[in-house]
Each structure stands twice: as C-alpha cells, then as structure tokens.
C-alpha cells in the first residue's frame, strides 16, 4: 500500500534524524525517538488496510435509513431538521474523538492503539490522507461506524421498531462522518488538485479550510480538532483544561452511546405530530 510504505520510510528517516541529533549534541544516544516511530521500527504498521466493501455497505445502510425512515416516515422537514442538528452533534463528536486519538497515551490502550498511532503519524505526514484513495480513508471509520450501526439497530428493535427519528439522526451521523473525512482530505489537498467547488465552500466557511486546519498541525496541536469546524471552540477550551486521558475516553464513550439518542428525542419533540 503506497501510504504504508511512505509512512515506514518516513519513520526510519525521522528515527535516524533523532539519533543523529542526539549524537551531535551530547555524544551519546538517548531514547528520544517518538513512541509511534519506535512501534514501527519494532514491526508495527503505521497504517493498516481496511475492508473497503464495508464502506459501501455502511453508506447504503445510512442512505436507506435517511430515505426509508427519514423522508418516507418522518417527512422531509424533520429529516432536514435532523441534518442541521446532527451537523453540530457529529462535529463535536469528531473533535472529541480527535482529542482521544491525538493522545499518545492511547497508543497503549486496546482498540485505540492502532488509530491513535495513525493520528500521531498524520502529524509527521500531513498529506497521507491525500495519497490514498478516498474510499480507503473512509475505511478508517469502519469500526466506529459499525459500532454506531449496531447500537442504532439494537435500540430501534428494543423500542418496538417505531423510533424512526433515531435511525434518521443515526443515518445523518454516519453520512456526516464520511463528509468529515472528505473535509479533512480537501484541507490537505493541493489547490491545483482540489475540486473548485470545494475551494469555494472552504473560502465561504462551509468546508474546513486549509488555513484553519493548519492551525491544528502547528505544535502543540491543541486547536481546530473538529472536522466540520462549527464546534471548535468548546472542544479546544476543554482540551486545554488538562482533564486527562480517562476523562476524554469517558466523554467519547458517553457521546457514542447517547448523543444521537438525545438528539433524536429532541427532534421528536420539535417535530411531534
């Protein structure tokens, strides 16, 4: 895989550079190599291949939710309303997830280890998302989208298969997650290769702009976490409070379980017939 080879080469180069700097300044070799680079030198892949057919399946299910349970059951206005609400919900969620995976400590936590390492590598190789097919980047969400789909389905069945708004909101959350991946990809894309409509949306504040996202790639990487850019300030404010890894993991798990449920309840009250 092209991105994996590039990352591995960059890892070796970065490691050699770190050692060389240590030798030249102190005469001894110190253990100053970043943890993610140590992992790669130890045999782990910085990026792994995801199952791309799952992406197609998740997109189809999401569209089914939006058409069958959104437009046909809830109506057009509630479905559009759900989009507006879930835009903010997904953006905040993406920021929280970003904080979690940017935390080096989580490279040692089961299930979080691989994606956390990939996020660390993204700081070394910012354009990695542009060097591979878009569907491959969408595949990075396979686990988290699959988890949401299982949760939405279980709650829908448990509720007597009548909670159409839950699946509508859930469909939007999954589709907007992929839109977030596209936003992020275009924020790193060369202007000459970026679609004109994306540049237009970036210039008008509808898509994440390269200038805004560059802020996150400037050390200490503690700003502009959100992929859609509408809830940046609360995530940044929380991120600078030094609340600790456990707090952020707990917040991430809580949002995974409850944000769409709470949003769907609110929407159901607003659009009650």
List the model feature ranges, each with a label.
Residues 86, 172, 178-191, 195:
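Flexible secondary-structure boundary motifs
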């Amino acid at each position: 895989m092209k991105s994996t080879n590039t990352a591995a080469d960059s890892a070796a180069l970065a490691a050699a550079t770190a050692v060389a700097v240590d030798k030249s300044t102190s005469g001894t070799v110190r253990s100053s190599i970043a943890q993610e680079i140590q992992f790669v030198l130890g045999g782990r892949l910085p990026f792994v291949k995801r199952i791309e057919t799952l992406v197609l399946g998740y997109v189809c299910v999401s569209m089914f939710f939006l058409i069958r349970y959104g437009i046909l059951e809830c109506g057009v206005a509630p479905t559009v309303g759900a989009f507006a609400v879930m835009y903010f919900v997904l953006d905040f969620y993406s920021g929280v997830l970003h904080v979690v995976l940017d935390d080096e400590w989580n490279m040692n936590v089961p299930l979080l280890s691989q994606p956390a390492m990939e996020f660390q590598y993204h700081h070394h190789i910012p354009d990695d998302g542009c060097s591979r097919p878009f569907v491959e980047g969408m595949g990075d969400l396979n686990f988290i989208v699959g988890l949401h789909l299982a949760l939405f389905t279980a709650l829908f069945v448990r509720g007597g298969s009548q909670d159409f708004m839950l699946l509508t909101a859930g469909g939007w959350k999954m589709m907007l997650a992929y839109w977030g991946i596209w936003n992020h990809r275009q924020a790193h894309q060369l202007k000459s290769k970026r679609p004109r409509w994306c540049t237009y949306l970036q210039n008008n504040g509808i898509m994440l702009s390269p200038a805004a996202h560059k802020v996150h790639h400037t050390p200490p990487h503690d700003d502009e976490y959100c992929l859609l850019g509408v809830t940046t300030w609360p995530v940044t404010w929380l991120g600078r409070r030094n609340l600790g890894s456990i707090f952020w993991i707990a917040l991430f798990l809580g949002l995974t379980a409850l944000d769409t449920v709470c949003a769907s309840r609110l929407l159901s009250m607003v659009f009650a017939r």
